[in-house]
Amino acid sequence: MPLTGPNDIQGVWATILCRLDDDNAPDLAAIDEQVAAYARAGCDGVYSGGTASEIHTQTDIQFREISARFAATARKHGLPFQIGAAHPLAHGTLGRVSFARTLDPGAIQVTLPDWTPLDLAGVVQFMDRVSEAADGTPLVLYNPPHAKTVLAPSDLVEIARALPTLVGIKCGGGDRGWYREMAPLLEQISVFIPGHHYATGRKLGAHGSYSNMACLSPAGAVTWARMSGREALELEGRIASFMADAISPMLNRGLPGFACDKAMAAAGRWTEISPRLMWPYIGATNTDVTQIRFAARRHLPEFLKAVHA
């Protein structure tokens, strides 16, 4: 069923992660296990093809196999789902979007071309062609802080005005001023921010998160999302301490964020996975995983307890 915006795309959405077999290829059985775990945890939706899914390392054949398996198991569990069809090259995006729409997802996530930056006119032109390839399937624009073209709120307002099929955006969020600038969009499209900022983001007007905290514990992330007021903000403070203790040191030594996401899943032990990444990336170490679990026990014991509840 197509997703139409804030009413359909809100709360905690969780990503599939690539468990690797002995040949360093994605183990498709892990998709079934992870989606089942997300359904048990009460996640609001699931998605594939984000950075944490290592889409930038997948061959086109792997992308198709993963997307098809994911769509089938998400449908089996009755979870709303989106398929990420990101590609660093514009024509590559069109090919992946054309395939993704055949799987009838609620929406397709796309990124902007990433070799050189685009101006606003170029972004609109690109998104218009993507919309044609999607053939009526709603679109979610994934515009992370590390993208070559990071869009300002005023740009997003213009793009949404020009593209009726745009129903959501995944972005880095911002301060109160950023949310004020985003106000014209907040009733029109779903705005998702980083998972560890969930409580403050929701308070300021965001609709939810494609959650990195669900990598540590899907049930923990959902439980936090259902809290309100001071309780939710207090937990967010402890999440910030956890991130500073466990994740920032990994980022500071050059590990990418998606390596941290996978290491968090290994530490959370809600799914069987190692921190190893697909070629050519180097993942976190087993020592990193142990340190993440230790930090979670210290700062977020309820996240680890939720795994076994």
Functional labels for PLM-detected ranges:
Residues 21-24, 59, 155, 262, ...:
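Solvent-exposed, flexible loop/coil residues
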Residues 129-135, 144-254:
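Catalytic alpha/beta core domains of metabolic enzymes, predominantly
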Residues 8-17, 41-43, 205-207, 217-309:
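C-terminal alpha-helical cap/extension of soluble enzyme domains
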Residues 2-149, 158:
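Active-site beta->alpha loop and helix N-cap motifs at the rims of alpha/beta catalytic domains
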Residues 63, 67, 93, 127, ...:
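A general structural signal for well-ordered alpha-helical segments in protein cores
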